[in-house]
């Protein structure tokens, strides 16, 4: 009888990527198939996030709901992974002794061995170590699910912003080798993926090793990814302003596959608060980078993260943030009320901004962003936009839905054979969370460029594998 696996995922896109890899890994090693609910599973994994307030308590509340499942089915395996697991470690077992597995973001590749240890008689297994990039060497070939895919190119962050737990939960920055990244993307392109989203906690800081030992910068990686036939769109997240350097800005002039959308978290528009956060830049430096980018891509859509009510934030500091929002003209934000993260330097500061003030400021910020977003969307009416068709519309399953380069959902009438392809549409109407359009051109009329076939990259990787004598051979594909 097929064993069932249930994974509950909280948090960022990196966690979503990790959960997909866990599922693929346990399918390839143990034959686990996906369960639709925790009740029908043989293994339950909770992939946690420590960014939001009271993340630890949220984990234990969820585990409490699963405790009865363990009582009814003693052979059930319950595991906790992700950033809270990395932070809490043994504490999870102390508070929830029925948990069998505790593993960090960098040790998910060891899940098959951990499960085998439990089946061999171990009472529990805990591994929250940081074995750098090892996990990517142990993961199975990626499986595409639709025309878009995430690809992790690096892990961790070395910036140590005073409010952030990432360096403590995912470790410092470690980049995957260039060939490994290109192979994964080529494999996905061979399965029909058209758009890749390159992931990392500080993705612009990518410094991957080339086959000859030299280092590849992020801008150089973008060129290599864009050259793969079938990959016609490139997104990436998350970035840090300090690492958003001129060579990356220049890439927007030479790489048409880079979409007209950038998510570049600034957190605050106040230099005083930015200094307290240890962000390493000023508001003026940030705006200068955005001006350079807009000279190359005048229509680029910009989004950001904002922390509201950081310790010591005054009315003047908040007004500086509002001024920055207007100057940059964001049309989307991920904004959060500040709450201390245990173990971070900011947690020792006095949280002197009242909850009422935080909520008022958050409302004003989101109101301004919404106004700007609506204005930008209205300006798109009558324009022609290229859409990657992702599938049926959520609003009307008889219609299709896709995204523009600037990450807006467009619903339109089309045929099922358009799914996975690009279409050009004329934008006819604007709604709160979507646009409406009419198809004017299909992909066969676009003349999308071809540079390097996915098959040639995969063939090169296979040719580089050592023979029986341990000697690697290379012949051009």
Curated annotation (Swiss-Prot):
A GO-annotated cellular component: cytosol
Pfam (any one): TRAM
Catalytic activity line of the entry: N(6)-dimethylallyladenosine(37) in tRNA + (sulfur carrier)-SH + AH2 + 2 S-adenosyl-L-methionine = 2-methylsulfanyl-N(6)-dimethylallyladenosine(37) in tRNA + (sulfur carrier)-H + 5'-deoxyadenosine + L-methionine + A + S-adenosyl-L-homocysteine + 2 H(+)
Name under which the protein is recorded: tRNA-2-methylthio-N(6)-dimethylallyladenosine synthase
Annotated Radical SAM core domain residues: 143-375
Binding positions ([4Fe-4S] cluster 2): 157, 161, 164
Domain MTTase N-terminal residue range list: 3-120
Similarity-based family: Belongs to the methylthiotransferase family. MiaB subfamily.
EC number: 2.8.4.3
Subunit annotation: Monomer.
Protein role: Catalyzes the methylthiolation of N6-(dimethylallyl)adenosine (i(6)A), leading to the formation of 2-methylthio-N6-(dimethylallyl)adenosine (ms(2)i(6)A) at position 37 in tRNAs that read codons beginning with uridine.
Cofactor note: Binds 2 [4Fe-4S] clusters. One cluster is coordinated with 3 cysteines and an exchangeable S-adenosyl-L-methionine.
